[in-house]
Amino acid sequence: MKFVDEALIKVEAGKGGNGCLSFRREKFIPRGGPDGGDGGDGGSIYFEASSDLNTLIDFRYTRQYKAENGQSGMGGNCTGKKGEDLTIKVPVGTMVYDADTGELLADISQPGVPVLIAQGGFHGLGNTRYKSSVNRSPRQTTPGSPGESRNLRLELRVLADVGLLGLPNAGKSTLIRAVSSSKAKVADYPFTTLHPGLGVVRVSPYKSFVMADIPGLIEGAAQGAGLGHRFLKHLSRTCVLLHVIDIAPLDGSDPVADAKAILNELTQYNPDLLNKPRWLVLNKIDMLPDEKEREEKIQSIIKGLKWKDKVFSISAIESKGTQELCYALMQLIDEMKESEA
């Protein structure tokens, strides 16, 4: 599924119903008093998180949402019907911003809990409300007020347990395809992943975690170069980061220098990301069939990065070492979630 992480929409709450101007007119009661009823309140617009959704793609096709207007009041002191509220379902983790001011209106992270985004208009008052001892036949009413109207920017941060980090063509898309049901676009040129993608990795019938395939970064991404820093934000909610490195780049670049460039981007964008658990994944070991040469390359990378945390050597395209990696990730995620409970 194509993963869309931003959308611009317009929402408009319902207008309140107008108050009614009416007088009681019945046989043998020639001068009945006022009996104009109030209007109904306009419908409000709520956002609600749904765990069944994981994309904002629907908002690319429907951009305008309007709640029902309140009904106007009627004679006989009948109040108009309230406009029906509109509840818009969004994926868990959706951030709702006012597109005009940039204000964060809501972080929709709890499924099943409606969050008010646009308040419906207040009902108008009928002429009955203005009856007094000095004005027995008021002709005054008030109209219903308009509902709130907002231009919104929806932003979805990937709710994933594992984030894949690395330069373009490090093999992240291949890895996520190898261990999950994700069908990420894979080819031998940079930026094959143009949208963040999610893959569910199932290590047993009752154990699974979500892996986020973040588009490849280049030097300067924190300032918006390449595919820009818009993708770095997807790493903020992951439990663990996998730093995927191409052990034998076809362009002859230095894997250590490549890795340091990514770490530099992380530091510039958000230094707190460096405090997350980060594991080193040395990919494409199939490109170095000689065992001695491969081991020397692995050790030189570890030494060059002064890496102290876990290291996994894999071939994503041949699924070598991926099972061990997934079991280790599942164990870490379980431990982290237990400690938070």
Swiss-Prot record:
Chain intervals for the UniProt region annotation (Disordered)? 128-150
Q: Which UniProt keywords apply?
A: Cytoplasm, GTP-binding, Hydrolase, Magnesium, Metal-binding, Nucleotide-binding
OBG-type G domain location: 160-334
Q: Record's Gene3D superfamilies? A: GTP1/OBG domain (2.70.210.12), P-loop containing nucleotide triphosphate hydrolases (3.40.50.300)
PROSITE patterns in the cross-refs:
G_OBG, GTP1_OBG, OBG
Q: Which GO terms describe its cellular component?
A: cytoplasm
Provide any one GO MF term from the record: GTPase activity
Q: Where in the cell is it found?
A: Cytoplasm
Q: Which Pfam families match?
A: GTP1_OBG, MMR_HSR1
Q: Which residues form the Obg domain?
A: 1-159
Binding residue positions for Mg(2+): 173, 193
Keyword hit for Nucleotide-binding: yes
Q: Which GO terms describe its biological process?
A: ribosome biogenesis
For activity, the cofactor(s) needed are: Mg(2+)
Bias category Polar residues: which stretches? 129-144
Q: Record's InterPro entries?
A: G_OBG, GTP-bd, GTP-bd_Obg/CgtA, GTP1-OBG_CS, GTP1_OBG_dom, GTP1_OBG_dom_sf, OBG_GTPase, P-loop_NTPase
EC number(s) given by UniProt: 3.6.5.-
The residues that hold GTP are 166-173, 191-195, 213-216, 283-286, 315-317
The family this protein is said to belong to: Belongs to the TRAFAC class OBG-HflX-like GTPase superfamily. OBG GTPase family.
This chain's function reads: An essential GTPase which binds GTP, GDP and possibly (p)ppGpp with moderate affinity, with high nucleotide exchange rates and a fairly low GTP hydrolysis rate. Plays a role in control of the cell cycle, stress response, ribosome biogenesis and in those bacteria that undergo differentiation, in morphogenesis control.
Q: How does it assemble?
A: Monomer.
Protein name (record): GTPase Obg
UniProt organism field: Legionella pneumophila (strain Paris)
The primary gene name is: obg
